[in-house]
Amino acid sequence: MRVVILGSAAGGGLPQWNCRCPICTLARSEPDRVRPRTQSSIAVSADGSDWLLINASPDIRQQLFDNPQMHPREGLRHSPIRAVLLTNGDVDHVAGLLTLREGQPYTLYGTRGILDSVNANRVFDVMAEGVVARQPIGMDQRFEPLPGLSVTLFPVPGKVPLWLEDETMEIGAETETTVGALIEAGGRRLAYIPGCARVTDGLRARIAGVDALLFDGTVLHDDDMIRAGVGTKTGWRMGHVPMRGANGSIDALAAVEIGRRVFVHINNTNPVLVEGSPERVDVEAAGWTVAHDGLSLSL
């Protein structure tokens, strides 16, 4: 199995377009210390030829350009992207669908709840019916988006997308609006969980024994944005478990048998983004890799 992290940042990317926090400032002025990053997306392949795109970020055109294995290879219209899977309906995971509209056939997969949110917005009708098939997938329903590559979706604690929040919103609920994906090919297993509000016993059992885990690395501490002075929301309020602190993911997953551990979906205020920082050193000493755009894994 081949995995390419196309985009490793959370919503807005790094640097965010209007942010002058210290980390965004370093990303502009000293990219050797803080690598710029695009928004959350990965691609997975069983054969290195046909690819499953998981989440379509607003930066998808640039991401595909930056990775030659994703370029058209034949005829006047072609893409090695054969299927797209959504793990939630967040803007940074669905806005890129508007770019993937140029008459290219593929199948769009997601839970019924996630696809319903897409179907309810007519702007996504630019993905022409009859060209892009929309296929709802049930929880724990194993399916093959590509030959030799199987995927099973499972609920993780989360919340509805920001643009669907109302007075009934529940943070930490396990529904089909936020899911993880267990991906298998050639006897190897990858768990991809870019959004997770807390680590539960059920989640630990689900991912035990995987060869690699790509996990929600949005915030280091629950109050990262407050500490940086750029926002008032906690990680919990946004539906993201912190790396460190009470119930932090590093400690919560420490005893779980996992091959490679990689943090993805990293917010611009997270100090682990700074190369060589004490926070980065601490996370790496705990056995985790901080993802960057273009990071590839062969499993």
Curated annotation (Swiss-Prot):
Q: Which family is this protein grouped under?
A: Belongs to the PqqB family.
Provide the GO biological process annotations.
pyrroloquinoline quinone biosynthetic process
InterPro entries, alphabetized: Metallo-B-lactamas, PQQ_synth_PqqB, RibonucZ/Hydroxyglut_hydro
Provide the species name: Methylobacterium radiotolerans (strain ATCC 27329 / DSM 1819 / JCM 2831 / NBRC 15690 / NCIMB 10815 / 0-1)
What name does UniProt use for this protein?
Coenzyme PQQ synthesis protein B
Q: In which pathway does it act?
A: Cofactor biosynthesis; pyrroloquinoline quinone biosynthesis
Keyword Transport present in the record's keywords: the answer is yes
According to its UniProt entry, what is the function of this protein?
May be involved in the transport of PQQ or its precursor to the periplasm.
Q: Which UniProt keywords apply?
A: PQQ biosynthesis, Transport
Q: Which domain of life is it from?
A: Bacteria
State whether keyword DNA-binding applies: no
